[in-house]
């Protein structure tokens, strides 16, 4: 493929040319005059297209929700993971996205440079209540594996809700919790606004933050930023639970649950 050198760049088909974007570079190649596809190739391309469309829907829903540095290969990685989910369907001749198969997304990482278990030593638990809210409980943390320059560790939970029909998706996030980087922390619970009767992919995000003159800056080192799918909850996974307000208010006083916290653009290191 040749690089596009014109002022106006494009993606997709334009006449007898096809434009591509790989990373931040645009390429172009000529379109073939005739395409030969076997029956199996046509089916495989249809499955890939179905996975790509759902991947695009989920990425649009998540736009601006994750604070970790963006990865150029995240698009293809998510499409590949969704294609694996689609192929798990063994009930339909034309494979469909089945809610129970979305569990295959658990463990999918948006940050190939750092897995979640590298920056977080504990395993969180997730429960969906009757109203659809997601309660992500993070156990007590003894030591934080964060950036050496960090003064705080920021932990958030983001949920992508895939609606029936698999053509629409929404996303919601909890308020961030700031933990002192040099001190152990007590257990806390993140509450994500939820939607009933949807498939919810719960993502836990851990980033390193530096405080300067009362302002918080996210550090850019990718080795200490992680975002990973920790659970996938189906439409029937709601559980009856009771949240005691005295405990919740006591935890709010002890842990810095910062509503409307502004994390300024990442610092270069």
Spans of features found by a protein language model:
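Generic signature of intrinsically disordered, low-complexity segments enriched in small/polar residues
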Residues: 13, 23, 29-30, 191, ...
């Amino acid at each position: 493929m040749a690089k596009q050198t014109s002022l106006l760049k494009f993606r997709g088909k334009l006449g007898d040319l096809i434009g591509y974007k790989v990373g931040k570079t645009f390429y172009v190649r000529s379109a073939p005059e005739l395409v030969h596809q076997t029956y199996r190739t046509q089916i495989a391309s249809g499955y890939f297209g179905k996975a790509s469309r759902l991947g695009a829907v989920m990425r649009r829903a998540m736009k601006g929700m994750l604070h970790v540095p963006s990865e150029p290969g995240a698009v293809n990685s998510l499409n590949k993971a969704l294609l694996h989910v689609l192929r798990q369907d063994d009930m339909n001749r034309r494979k469909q996205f089945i809610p129970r198969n979305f569990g295959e997304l658990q463990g999918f990482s948006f940050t190939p440079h750092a897995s979640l278990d590298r920056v977080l030593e504990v395993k969180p638990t997730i429960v969906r209540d009757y109203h659809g809210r997601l309660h992500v409980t993070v156990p007590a943390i003894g030591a934080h594996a964060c950036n050496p320059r960090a003064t705080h560790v920021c932990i958030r939970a983001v949920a992508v809700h895939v609606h029936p029909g698999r053509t629409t998706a929404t996303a919601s996030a909890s308020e961030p919790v700031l933990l002192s980087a040099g001190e152990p922390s007590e257990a806390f619970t993140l509450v994500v606004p939820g939607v009933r009767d949807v498939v919810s992919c719960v993502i836990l995000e851990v980033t390193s933050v530096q405080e300067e003159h009362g302002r918080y800056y996210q550090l850019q080192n990718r080795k200490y930023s992680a975002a990973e799918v920790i659970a996938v909850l189906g439409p029937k996974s709601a559980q009856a639970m009771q949240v005691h307000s005295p405990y919740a208010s006591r935890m709010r006083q002890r842990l810095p649950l910062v509503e409307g916290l502004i994390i300024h653009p990442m610092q270069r290191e």
